[in-house]
Every structure is written in structure tokens, then in C-alpha cells.
């Protein structure tokens, strides 16, 4: 439940002031750039005046900079146009992969167009209740984790066998 990110509180004049205090400015800049928010003049604005795409990227960067190892974004790309959704998904995928397996990201979305950009390790489709390996991630680690999932799915103890990016 505490991994679920519904929204962050932003009440400062510059949204950067709401980022984790322990985060170094170099890491903040690197993370904002890694999620595709590469406009330093916009970094000085209040969160409320950002575009939906900038808000999405800001929230993603803040989640990455948080101490949480697992975070879940519901309606991951629903408030942005589809091109921004794809670009944001690619940027997020790269940022998570660069975390050296320190972060896990679960994207909850009804939009299938982001799958090839997000390149999740696993996909759970609620339309037909199927759980599958992403076609691009069929490496040994993912196969091992998927096998563990198959063995433990009836026990309800599957949280530890998942990988970095799940959709």
C-alpha cells in the first residue's frame, strides 16, 4: 500500500524544493533528465503551472529519488497524449534499468501502446487475467522469475519473484 503513488504533495514555489531533502542536486538533475524532463527553466516553476506531461515526469523523478524500492503508478500515462506517454515510458524504462536493480516499478495502465516503450519484464492483462513474460525480456533472469511465479501463484506469496518493470 505505501508503494502506491496516487499523488505527491507540492506546496513550494519551486517544485524542486518538494523533492527529498537528502537527494543531491546533481542526482535531481540527472533523474529529471533521465525521465525526459530536460528544461531547467521549467524546474523553477511551481508544480501547479506545469503541463500534464511535465507533472508526470516530475512525479516519476520524485519517485525514483525517494527511498522506496518499489513504487506503483496507477493510470501511468492516462493524463498525457500518446506521444508523450511513449516518450515518458521509454525514459522511465531507462531510468529504472539504470538503477542497478535497486528499484521496482509497476505501471498500471489501460493503454497497450506503451508496452513496447516501457519494455516491462512481465505483463498482467486484466482483460483476460493472463500473466506473461514480455516478448523483449525473455532472458534467463526473467525466465527464472516467471517460473518462480508459476510455482507460487496459488500460494499468494509472489511479490518477491517479480522483476524491475511490470505493467
Predicted regions and their residues:
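Loop/turn-to-beta-strand initiation segments
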Residues: 68-70, 98-106
